[in-house]
A protein has these predicted regions:
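Phosphate/nucleotide-binding beta-alpha loop and adjacent structural elements of enzyme active sites
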Residues: 1-221
């Protein structure tokens, strides 16, 4: 398996994610994929390669410097739509907060005593319900938004039924019960803790990365 798509990230869980997505056939030629919180575009690159020229990839990143890198990297990719926007629960504007590294960039204002954040700018925001309302089906949405998971999920309730899979990175323990309810009950997904390699149920602890999908005989774990 070629993991060069991930490039800058290189986490073991990311490699597992790519393997699972490919093995389960969750992303195919001609389909639509979304990378929310693209950072340097590792997943965007994998998605674009998987869906081919006939497919479509939406790539959203809030940090201007990182977005500039994405524009350069994917300037010749006609199947990628680049968005310097926050994916959120409303269409409007969100504040951008950042600490000493890109890993702390978020729209929630959350920081730590070791790496506090401050407001560094503003960015336009859009709901996935709005962005994807004209798509007939979405193969997969990857969400890595440094604690704004609930905002993204609440903003995609209208398009959840036509979304086949989610890959979501979880950050705050206090948000996990709500996230778990949305994924399992509201959206009706099967969910899998990638790091622990086990199914997620109502009693499961928060995973770091969670793969969610609509199970059939062809894509069971």
């Amino acid at each position: 398996m070629d993991f060069s798509y991930i490039g800058e990230a290189g986490y073991d869980d990311d490699q597992k994610n790519i393997t699972l997505i490919n093995r389960m056939g969750l992303l195919n030629i001609g389909e639509t994929a979304v990378d929310v919180g693209a950072n340097h575009g590792g997943y965007t690159s994998f998605f674009a390669s998987s869906v081919g020229a006939a497919g479509n990839v939406y790539c959203a990143e809030i940090l201007p410097f990182t977005f500039s890198h994405l524009k350069t990297r994917f300037s010749n990719h006609s199947n990628i739509t680049l968005l310097n926007m926050a994916i959120s629960d409303s269409n409007g504007t969100e504040s951008i907060y950042a600490g000493s590294s890109t890993e702390t960039v978020n729209i929630t204002g959350f920081g730590t005593t070791i790496d506090p954040v401050c407001k560094v700018g503003e960015v336009k925001s859009i709901k996935l319900d709005t962005l994807l309302e004209h798509e007939e089906q979405i193969a997969i949405i990857k969400i890595d938004v440094e604690g704004a998971e609930l905002k993204v999920l609440d903003g995609m309730r209208q398009i959840a039924d036509k979304t086949k899979a989610l890959l979501i990175e979880c950050h705050f323990q206090e948000d996990w019960p709500k996230i778990k309810k949305i994924l399992l009950d509201d959206f009706g997904f099967q969910c899998y803790n990638v790091g622990r390699e086990e199914r997620i149920n109502q009693d499961s602890p928060m995973p770091y990365q969670c793969l969610c999908w609509r199970e059939d005989e062809n894509n069971s774990i």
